[in-house]
Amino acid sequence: MNAIDGTSRQLKDTEDQTLDDTPSLLSIIIDAHVPSWEEIKSQISISEAVASILVFINAHLALHNSNSVNVIGYNASGARILYPPKSGVESTRSKEREERSESVSDGEQAPSKKDHSMYRQFKTVDEVVQTELWNMLNHTNYVEEEKQHNSAISGALSLALGFINKHVFVDESRMRARILLLTVGHKNETIQYIPTMNCIFAAQKLKIPVDVCKLGPGSDQVFLQQACDSTHGIYMDISEKNSKTPKGLVQYLLSGFISDPSLRPHIVLPTQSNVDFRAACFLTKQVVDIGYVCSVCLCIMSQIPSNRRCPTCDTTYSEKTLAGLGRKPLKKKKKKVVKP
Amino acid sequence: MTSQFKNSINDYLEGLPEAVLTRLYQSPATCLAVFRLLPALARTLIMGMIFNPDPIAVADVDALVKPSSQRLKLETQKKLRLLHIFTETQAHIIINPTFKKNLRAALVGGDQNISFGVPCDTEDKHKVDVAFLDAHAVSQWEMILHFMVGTSIGRTPSDGVLNLLKHSGLMEPERGGLRITNAGFQFLLQDVNAQIWTLLLQYLNMSEYLQMDPVDVLNFIFMLGSLELGQDYSLSALSETQKHMLEDLRDYGIVYQRKASSRRFYPTRLATTLTSETAALRTASQSMEAATQDTISSSVAADSGFIILETNFRLYAYTESPLQIAVLNLFVNLKTRFANMVTGQINRDSVRFALSNGITAEQIITYLSVHAHPRMKGMEHVLPPTVVDQIKLWQLEMDRIRATDGYLFSEFKNFDEYKDVSTYAKELGVLLYENPGKRKFVSTLAGSQQIVEFVKRRNQKHRSSAN
Amino acid sequence: MPKATRGVLIECDPSIKALIVNIDSSQHNIILDELDDTHLMIHPSMVEVVKQKLNKMLAENTYNPNEEAAKATGK
């Protein structure tokens, strides 16, 4: 008679061989930092990369008819949501596009309204993403960009997480979410470590995998590898350093990064990372074994900072504490043992 | 619910020969629709292979899937093989080139193809808006359902529809009219999307009789699934078969044409949600908007529930639609009708009446939970477990005995004879029941003949060996 | 030569079997053979009769609030 028991005992299928067919929301964060793209111009041009990204977006939308996508671009001056556009923006943009058809660089053909040979869903997304991304790239102040070395990865991640939170959790639609970060490494890039790590922890809590696809020749950013590792995402470095070529970006995207969150438990993830979990000093960027730790924010330093302030949380250390750190350990005088 | 239609359209596609499938894959819209019907692992594999010019090694696929999910991989490969998307050689998997090319075209676009429908360039003098299309779809569809249930609504569907209902076994001719069958009852309890697919699949089966090319029919159906609501499309892109189909689809309410000679048609919501999840996936914010704007009727987009079921088996349905009341009447003892509501009780007799008409307990329970009022859906159990259990128990009551026609074999001379014959019957697979203690067993009707002959042969052998 | 008899194999639980044996005691043309606690062979043409009689006997033992209400209003 247990067979008819209607009370739902949530017996988990131990084999779990059936895949749940939930739609997923993909947040793509694209690096729009023009100087970085300039550096790798010989390996891949921006228009080729954008075309690959658009095909990837179409592929994601093709996987399930309720899949949706969210595109965010970031550069030194900040991050911006490119798709879905604010309502009202879309209609004005299409009007502007029809009036001046040559506002895009690299001689891209203005997408025409008459061309309906593509699936309508793909077409709308592609058009909006393309125009918005070109606008963002065109309107950046090139000179200013070169001077600033901040990159707004944390801003972009926060925007992505906020969007996901609204659409998946607040609206209670049955979707899973993931984030893909497409970055072109810049050798002098400084990131705000703590805000970025906060975003990563938030993603970890919400079980949102963060994937990273790195194109440029810059060194492996350890924090990105750690981000992928802690959220069970995929980290791939497609640069000539690893004897891969960014020209095949579309194939890497479609084979490595296409897997849905619901499919991930069943396949071996193509992540390449030997994550360096060793601690690194915040001042000298060297790996430390023994060092000093700030008592407020727990940041690690290999030497006492010269201005007596912590580099990350900016607390001032008092003279007395710092003086105490320089002391050598006290030697206890040994009492002479008198033999009887 | 959408998984049901997936299975049946999958079965239909798997039954087609390879040549037909290859012709089918020449349309990017069809490739996209078929792609979406595949299991998740298959979709991921195919995506990785679309832009890859070389075939993939089987070893690579094996390495991709975790060892604990091997069964998934085998099922996926089998399905892809049946649909002729993959051909496997000794060590490599090659993807069907037509499928590959056209799926790529669907993703990349630019190729001048008409499989996604050609919208009209000229303005329509009698333009219709989305609200009109919705109302039209609802009225056409409900007309068919009302006719099936038997509530007189004044209009009867056209001959083509009646023909389809007869052929599909949903209704049977009886004394000059049509009467609903058991299958028809089950059809009524399905949700709109599943109902449309059932009819379309029947239409596909019928089309082979009518000498219509199934490839054209399927292409058109999948194209409809990718059209935009509110946009008119021209007939110039359709083949003769497809134009012919348009007349039938007009009767079902899937497309709208102002008159039969019109050069344009509008897809309705029934068409655009063909290949998507159950009607409109409304989010909380959208529902708020809709409530304040007072838009679309709720009977087509079956996402607003109206049934409240209490633990004392009483049922309250906030609906005025005669169709829904008629469906409820199939298994609920309706007692009172108010201006905006009907009340009744689910009891043994009403459920047994439904069961004897061929409706299963599962269907009743699914219908109730799909149309449950949003307040019920918020609770831990959508329907009270007592009621759910009781409906299932009533169904069990119906078949307390299982009867099978057969032959009883008894009076064996000795145990060896019994053992030989019963083992033979077991190997044939016709043994229903055996009792070694009493040396009796029962076999099916069909198998009895073979057993009798076996016994004769055995006896002859023994007699000859004894002599 | 073993004997082969045409019939219908009935699978049920012991309580139902007891009910069928009970029906048979008044009408002796139903059961061909009692095989064990849960299986019976009965005459092919008597299957429907058995089912109807079973339903009637089981219905007698179920509480039906509608009947109660009908009786109350009737009286």
Curated annotation (Swiss-Prot), chain A:
GO terms for molecular function: zinc ion binding. It is found in: Nucleus. It holds the Pfam family Tfb4. Residues 92-103 have a biased composition (Basic and acidic residues). One of its GO terms (cellular component) is transcription factor TFIIH holo complex. Belongs to the TFB4 family. This is General transcription and DNA repair factor IIH subunit TFB4. The lineage of its organism: Eukaryota, Fungi, Dikarya, Ascomycota, Saccharomycotina. The gene is TFB4.
From Swiss-Prot, chain B:
InterPro entries: Tfb2_C, TFIIH_p52/Tfb2. Keywords: DNA damage, DNA repair, Nucleus, Transcription, Transcription regulation. GO terms for biological process: nucleotide-excision repair; transcription initiation at RNA polymerase II promoter. Component of the general transcription and DNA repair factor IIH (TFIIH) core complex, which is involved in general and transcription-coupled nucleotide excision repair (NER) of damaged DNA and, when complexed to TFIIK, in RNA transcription by RNA polymerase II. In NER, TFIIH acts by opening DNA around the lesion to allow the excision of the damaged oligonucleotide and its replacement by a new DNA fragment. In transcription, TFIIH has an essential role in transcription initiation. Component of the 7-subunit TFIIH core complex composed of XPB/SSL2, XPD/RAD3, SSL1, TFB1, TFB2, TFB4 and TFB5, which is active in NER. The core complex associates with the 3-subunit CTD-kinase module TFIIK composed of CCL1, KIN28 and TFB3 to form the 10-subunit holoenzyme (holo-TFIIH) active in transcription. Transmembrane segments: none annotated. One of its GO terms (cellular component) is transcription factor TFIIH core complex. It comes from the Eukaryota. It is found in: Nucleus. This is General transcription and DNA repair factor IIH subunit TFB2. One of its GO terms (molecular function) is ATPase activator activity. It holds the Pfam family Tfb2. Belongs to the TFB2 family.
Swiss-Prot record, chain C:
Its main location: nucleus. It is found in: Nucleus. Keywords: DNA damage, DNA repair, Nucleus, Transcription, Transcription regulation. The keyword DNA damage applies. One of its GO terms (biological process) is transcription initiation at RNA polymerase II promoter. GO terms for cellular component: cytosol; transcription factor TFIIH core complex; transcription factor TFIIH holo complex. Coiled coil: none annotated. Component of the 7-subunit TFIIH core complex composed of XPB/SSL2, XPD/RAD3, SSL1, TFB1, TFB2, TFB4 and TFB5, which is active in NER. The core complex associates with the 3-subunit CTD-kinase module TFIIK composed of CCL1, KIN28 and TFB3 to form the 10-subunit holoenzyme (holo-TFIIH) active in transcription. Component of the general transcription and DNA repair factor IIH (TFIIH) core complex, which is involved in general and transcription-coupled nucleotide excision repair (NER) of damaged DNA and, when complexed to TFIIK, in RNA transcription by RNA polymerase II. In NER, TFIIH acts by opening DNA around the lesion to allow the excision of the damaged oligonucleotide and its replacement by a new DNA fragment. In transcription, TFIIH has an essential role in transcription initiation. Belongs to the TFB5 family. This is General transcription and DNA repair factor IIH subunit TFB5. The gene is TFB5.
